[in-house]
């Protein structure tokens, strides 16, 4: 995952909205956040495919790395877990 994570997790408690920084969660996660997210690799692929039914979509991770081959867009996220279904180029 990106070392530049600087967002917030927003929680509603009673009627008060509370923000917590995400960076400490990422820095101290055991197992690592990448290991946790790799469990959702199939779900991320399915989401990307769903978005592509609506219109052409390349995830931000692919755009930031100048990935121009749209056939590889379903593998364009940083916690992708290689499987036997994936092409060698992925």
Swiss-Prot record:
Pfam families membership: Poty_coat
GO cellular component: viral capsid
PTM entry text: Genome polyprotein of potyviruses undergoes post-translational proteolytic processing by the main proteinase NIa-pro resulting in the production of at least ten individual proteins. The P1 proteinase and the HC-pro cleave only their respective C-termini autocatalytically. 6K1 is essential for proper proteolytic separation of P3 from CI.
Keywords associated with the record: Capsid protein, Virion
Domain of life of the native organism: Viruses
Similarity annotation: Belongs to the potyviridae genome polyprotein family.
Name of the molecule in the record: Genome polyprotein
Originating organism: Gloriosa stripe mosaic virus (GSMV)
